[in-house]
Amino acid sequence: MTKTFYVYLMTNRSRVVLYTGITNSLVRRVWEHQNGDIEGFTKKYRVNRLVYYENFDDPRNAISREKEIKGWRRGKKNALVETLNPKWTDLSPMLFQGMRGPSSSSPPG
């Protein structure tokens, strides 16, 4: 069974901040961000809206892509988000369809 790795971008309601991360479980990780389970930057700035993600079979490629995106200026990151999600819609409801959602007491997946 092959694992999938994800590079994702999340923002807050006002889109003031844009966070880039990597995970092997996008559903679980988004749930953790939305519930404030991750101390630090994302909790402080209430980063809870998934606006972009890519998937990879090889973790080295995912790590490389995450580093690449983190090195970009904000304008280039915004343009990347808009290639998939021009309205900056929160994509997390799509992830949680048919699963225990963000209101559950434990993370889905």
Predicted regions: what they are:
Residues M1-I38, K43-Y53, R60-K67, L84-P86, ...:
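GIY-YIG nuclease catalytic motif and its immediate N-terminal context
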